């Protein structure tokens, strides 16, 4: 290295001295002639002498500095390369250790038994760190909401976690398509804690709802919710979850009798709700005027309803509330034949028997008419009511009014929720499997059982606002069946989103 430096200095010394160069500068006229511009003018020639200064001490020092800079740069690059290789080796070793430690831990995750997070630590820094970690898990999961190495994740088993950073998913006051019957904060409910609970499955994560991806999934397609007012509750939730992401003037709500349509023109997508509380044709088919206590279904008539939803790309049925007894000894009528043909016959049956008749007719129709290569079918589980506060140690006169916390009893089940009806639905829909038609059950019942705090009660408007006398009588007028929005139905739709996008 040093011999190269001295050789360089000797070469510099040889070039030292004074050099004289003579530059001949032609006048503009001469330059014009050279370019072919012939003018009768004399050519003027100017001479200029340029002197180059000798390369002295300053030049030598400059060369030395430049040389040392080059040598230092090469050495630094070599050192950094060695450091990078060492860091890579350490990182690979740590990654292997983490993988070995995580293998037994993945099995332990599913063994969690707690339903709720301790209230005293919900707002603590530790809770925030845990939530951030969970978000990272969701963002990097394998797509089905499960942990690595787990083939199936049961989203319906888990706990409610208070989360004031990512909940609610939207503002009920800003959703322009919300219905007054579930707009609780609009009608005077001041506590908003019910909006900030997030459902956390045991041992896995529920995929986060992405409205833009969901709308893209619905591009040129139609999603239909078919059922009663609880299903309409879920439909309103879905509309509120996506409408904020659609520009004004590019969305619309259309009423057409029993059909309500939300249209997203940007995507040529439609999200419908169709009123059909008993699934078959019945005396309750009018979405506004219908008799609740005296119910009649036509056992062999479904075509009028089916013509509305059979060509949809995605269908979400529900049917539970209207099959429940409103009083002891309540029954219903099943009609066979028609009065027009003169063969009408009415049978009186138990409510649950009518439910089975309706599901079998629906299944028969789906098996014969649905396009299994196009349409995906879902059936929402039973939505529990919280009308009897004594079930959790409260006052029945208030029903679920003034409740601000979920029920913190693991695996809590209300005595009024009929789980056998869902078992019957699974059994009946299972007969479609040999035909290649799968009805996916949205198992929403258990997670909803905990949420006694999430109903509209008196904070709602049903056609007309409640009077002062009605507000003062919650035992009759508090709605503990439907759900405030934002709220529990948002999680139902997260289930639907997860199935549509990841399974």
UniProtKB/Swiss-Prot annotation:
Domain of life: Eukaryota
Enzyme Commission numbers on file: 2.3.1.-
Subcellular location: Golgi apparatus membrane
InterPro entries, A to Z: TBL, TBL_C, TBL_N
GO process terms (BP): defense response; xylan acetylation
Entry keyword set: Disulfide bond, Glycoprotein, Golgi apparatus, Membrane, Plant defense, Signal-anchor, Transferase, Transmembrane, Transmembrane helix
Carbohydrate attachment residues: 154, 164, 190, 210, 256, 268, 373, 402, 443
Topology term for the membrane: Single-pass type II membrane protein
Cytoplasmic compartment spans: 1-54
Lumenal domain ranges by topology: 78-503
Motif interval(s): GDS motif: 227-229
Predominant place of localization: Golgi
GO CC entries: Golgi apparatus; Golgi membrane
Effect of deleting the gene: Stunted growth and reduced plant height. The double mutants tbl1 and tbl2 exhibit increased susceptibility to the bacterial pathogen Xanthomonas oryzae pv oryzae (Xoo).
Molecular function GO labels: O-acetyltransferase activity; xylan O-acetyltransferase activity
Disulfide bonds, paired cysteine numbers: 153-204, 175-240, 184-484, 400-480
Family: Belongs to the PC-esterase family. TBL subfamily.
UniProt function note: Xylan acetyltransferase required for 2-O- and 3-O-monoacetylation of xylosyl residues in xylan. Catalyzes the 2-O-acetylation of xylan, followed by nonenzymatic acetyl migration to the O-3 position, resulting in products that are monoacetylated at both O-2 and O-3 positions.
Name of this protein: Xylan O-acetyltransferase 12
Gene: XOAT12
